Structures are given as C-alpha cells and as structure tokens.
C-alpha cells in the first residue's frame, strides 16, 4: 500500500505538477534541493541531487543552493546535507573542494551585507529598520546583515534572483514563517521575480512540502501582490 502511494505521488509529480510550470529544469532542481534540506529529507535529496547532476546542473550551483538555506533553516538542519552533498559529489568524481565563491571578508561582510539588503529591499526601508531596532536587539540586525546577506547573498555561483527565490522556497518549506515569506515575496518582486514565477515555484514544491505550507505560501504571495 505504501509503495502504491509513493508510485502514485511520483506519477502525479511527473504528469501533473512538472508540466504546470514555466520553471526551467535547473531552477526546479535547486528549489527542490532547498526544500528537502528544510524538510529534512536526505534520501529524496540524494535522488534529486543525482538527477540534477545528470541533467547538467553544476556542482557549484548545487552547493550554493544548499549554502543559501543555512541562514534560514539553521546550521543544525543544514550541516548533514552539506556533508551529504560532498559525499555524493565525491562519488560522482567531482574534485573537492570546489572553487571558492565567497566575495567578502571579516572586515567587509557587514558593510556589503547592508548594501545587498538595500539593493533588495530599498535603502530607506533597511536604514529605517536598523535605526528603529531597540538597543538590546541591534546586534541581531548586525548578525542578519553580515551573516545572512554579507556571507551568503554576496557569493558568486548563483545570481541574486536565484538566491532570493531559493530563500522563498526554503521559508515556504520550513513552515511557520509567514512574516518572513511576505517580506521575501516583496524581495523577489523587487529583484525581478514576478508573481507567476513564485506561483510556479510553489506548484513544484507542493507534493514535497504538503498543502498547508503551500497554501500559506500562496497566501503570502496574494497578500503582497494584491498591494502592487
């Protein structure tokens, strides 16, 4: 019975979900990898990673998609997937370590992180958010700017539009992130990812993250895009 259920789900994904989207194969694979990190699904992650490599997604793109989940899912959830990614790449004959993609240093990560936030969300919005933070929480704002944006969004290997879409997919897959999803729906719109792209992303995620999280993600999209 469980096998029939799994086969039925696979057929649904192949015959109904995949065609109902304009996402290219690379984007779909990267979003699904992020979702499987967030949902802690290593066996399916392994299958998708191998399929992605077979279909021409580069090791750097794959590794960067996993890295992009770290500030949202947390290191406790992502560490084993980084190890698993390295193990699969090694099994496939990929020489490790991969070329470094970091562009910031200890001295520049905060400044460049703030600049990246401003590019995505607007200078006035970010400056106001940082200025209005209570004194006892200003260090959190610095952590957010330096780590989330300075350490990850500034990396090469994936462009800013891809990273922002991966962030939305990770948040949707985690669940309980409605406020952050709304913020990153706006972020996606700001960098040029439109409503249809976000809906296409949720459509591809739905079989893996379930209806409640998918419907919450759609609600966030509707909430923000209705105000545009």
Predicted regions and their residues:
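Short conserved catalytic/interaction loops centered on acidic-Pro-aromatic/His motifs
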Residues: 46-48, 178-186
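Substrate/cofactor-recognition hotspot
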Residues: 64, 70-76
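Short, structured motif recognition centered on aromatic/hydrophobic residues
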Residues: 27-36, 45, 62-66, 162-172, ...
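Single conserved hydrophobic/aromatic residue that forms the stacking wall/gate
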Residues: 1-8
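C-terminal structured interaction module
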Residues: 190, 196-197
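Acidic, glycine/proline-rich low-complexity segments that act as flexible tails and inter-domain linkers
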Residues: 9-26, 39, 43-54, 78-160, ...
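Short, glycine/charged-rich beta-strand-loop motifs at protein surfaces that mediate ligand recognition
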Residues: 156, 169-175, 188
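Winged helix-turn-helix DNA-binding recognition segment
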Residues: 57-61
